[in-house]
Structure formats: C-alpha cells, structure tokens
Amino acid sequence: MPIDNLPPLREVIDTYGLQAHKSLGQNFLFDLNLTSKIAHQAGTIEGKPVLEIGPGPGGLTRALLAKGAIVTAIERDERCIPALLEIEKHYPNQLKLICNDALKQDFSKLFGSSPEKPRIIANLPYNIGTQLLLNWLLVEPWPPFYESMTLMFQREVAKRITAKPQSSHYGRLSVLTGWRTIAKIAFDVPPQAFIPAPKVTSSVVHIIPRAQPLVCSAQKLSLITKTAFGQRRKMLRQNLKTLGGEIILEKAGIDGTRRAETLSISEFVTLANLIT
C-alpha cells in the first residue's frame, strides 16, 4: 500500500529511471513495514526535527513524514532529487532537501539555530556510514547537535559498534561509541528488503548520547584507540611505543602484555589522558 496516495516506490524507481549505484553505497529500502518500523524505533517524532542522510527515492522519508516529522534530507545523488521533490509537494513545509555530500556538510551549523535538536534517522550509504558515525561521535562541543541516532548498517558493522571488551568485534569503533553514547542493536533487516539485495544482513542501531561521558579529549582517545588496535594481536607495549608505550601503561597501572581488545573504555580513557 502506498503512503498518503503517493505512487509505490517501484513505480517511482521506474518513472525516474533510478538504479542504485554501488559506487555511492546505495541499497534502496522498499519494504514499507520496515521503513515504518525504523521510524517508530526513533520514538515520537511528530512535529520533531529529523535529519535523514541518503534518502534515495524516499522510502524511509515517506515513513518519517507520515509520522509527522519535520525532515531535513541530504542527498548527494542528483538523480534522486526529482523524486524527492514530488514528496516535498505532498508534504508542504515538512521536507527540506539539500543536495550535498553528507561528509562535507556542517551539521552543527545546519541545526545551530534550531530550538530543538534533531534525531538522525537514516539508512546510511554503506560506503560512508562508518565515517559519518565517527564524525558524529567525535563532534565538538558535547553534548552534540543531535538528540539520538537510529541508523542502518551492515550487520558486521553494527556488531562492531555495540561490541564489549574481550570479543572479536570489539575495537576502536566500539570504544568511541561506548565512551560517549549508549548503543544497542534494535533489529535486523534481511537482504530481500532492499533493491538491489545486498549479500549481507543489515541491522538498525539506536544510539543515545551520554550527557556526561568520562572526561577525555576526543582527539586523544581517537588516536590511542587507532594506535592500540592497529595490530590487534600484538601486545599494548608494542602497539603504543610511539605514544609513550611502557611509560603511560605503567602510570595507568595496565599490564603492557595485554592486548587492546581486553581493555575497558575507562582504561582507554585513562591512557588517552596520559598522552602528552
């Protein structure tokens, strides 16, 4: 069933000759039950500002608008703009389109004067999803410009985002996410929900910023985690040589023969605060 008398998404794709481009990391989400489920996962959004990245032909966009959200959608692919403009006509004053590369967008400036923080809700393009998340996790000042994030990733990336110490998926992304936010996998999305169908399962991750994360420089924590996990099978005293190695490990009371995947987030914060 189409939403609010708009054409079915398959018809939109045919009308505008839209095909997902692998180079842009595109996989169009067609299942309207799933788009509604993603929108619902973000909580009550009626009358609330929402930021969507990579709307494509507008499947998730329509679900967000149908729930009353005020959507700012950033789309790099100019081919999709005419289809999105048709949706904009149907929802006057509810949808703002920006044709831009999300990696180059100044989000703080975009929402700086807004009285209410946006919720970021998106089926992120696979090729920029992780980098966008890192940018949003390391943004300054903190608390950030957004209220929450409800994002689609490949299942393996979602596991890395939410992983705990001592697990194979635990790494830099897990530490940076857990430091500043509380993240959980909400539900999985099968490949057949997309066109074209990816080879892997996807997962929707819900992320809420912590009001007061452990005190630490984002830049230093980013550096220490990148260095520590650079060669994850090596001992910390070897991986951290360029950052003071055994000296900072001794000051932190951390055994230099441990591996990065055994450290808690608070231990990484302690190490980061010792970098000069």
UniProtKB/Swiss-Prot annotation:
Family: Belongs to the class I-like SAM-binding methyltransferase superfamily. rRNA adenine N(6)-methyltransferase family. RsmA subfamily.
The keyword Transferase belongs to this UniProt entry's keyword annotation: yes
Known function: Specifically dimethylates two adjacent adenosines (A1518 and A1519) in the loop of a conserved hairpin near the 3'-end of 16S rRNA in the 30S particle. May play a critical role in biogenesis of 30S subunits.
Protein keywords: Cytoplasm, Methyltransferase, RNA-binding, rRNA processing, S-adenosyl-L-methionine, Transferase
GO cellular component, one term: cytosol
Organism: Bartonella tribocorum (strain CIP 105476 / IBS 506)
Gene3D superfamilies given in the database record: Ribosomal RNA adenine dimethylase-like, domain 2 (1.10.8.100), Vaccinia Virus protein VP39 (3.40.50.150)
This protein's name: Ribosomal RNA small subunit methyltransferase A
Catalytic activity: adenosine(1518)/adenosine(1519) in 16S rRNA + 4 S-adenosyl-L-methionine = N(6)-dimethyladenosine(1518)/N(6)-dimethyladenosine(1519) in 16S rRNA + 4 S-adenosyl-L-homocysteine + 4 H(+)
Entries under SMART domains matching the protein: rADc
